[in-house]
């Protein structure tokens, strides 16, 4: 019986000591993986930030182009006063001095060609 007890105690001590070593080893592996994961997350975060900045720059550029285009589309309709030096009449209209009924206004108006 004593040999069985001694053998059992020996196996128990070996299992506990090896198990403890495995636990420490597992803890070290987990720490390494966590550190690698953090560096990977930092890299992914920086990459995403760069892509977002590029996208934002493109959107701002498109907005400024749209603003320029919308300013070009603005025009003055028919029968509306216009400036002789800077006519902004819509296409198909010309900035002319009014005849007869509008002479007293001393202004130019957009009329059909």
Swiss-Prot record:
The keyword Disulfide bond applies. Expressed by the venom gland. One of its GO terms (molecular function) is sodium channel inhibitor activity. The keyword Aminoacyl-tRNA synthetase does not apply. InterPro entries: Toxin_22 (IPR012627). Residues 60-83 are annotated as: Disordered. Residues 60-69 have a biased composition (Basic and acidic residues). Its main location: secreted. It is found in: Secreted. Residues 22-74 form a propeptide. Probable ion channel inhibitor. This is U11-theraphotoxin-Hhn1a.
């Amino acid at each position: 019986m004593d040999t069985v007890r001694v053998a059992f105690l020996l196996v128990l001590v070996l299992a506990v000591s090896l198990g403890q070593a495995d636990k420490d080893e597992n803890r070290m592996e987990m720490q390494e993986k966590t550190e690698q994961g953090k560096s990977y997350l930092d890299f992914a975060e920086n990459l995403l930030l760069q892509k977002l900045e590029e996208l934002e720059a493109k959107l701002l550029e498109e907005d400024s182009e749209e603003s320029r285009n919308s300013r070009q589309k603005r025009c003055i309709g028919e029968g509306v006063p216009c400036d002789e030096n800077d006519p902004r009449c819509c296409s198909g209209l010309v900035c002319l001095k009014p005849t007869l009924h509008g002479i007293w206004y001393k202004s130019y108006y957009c009329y059909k060609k």
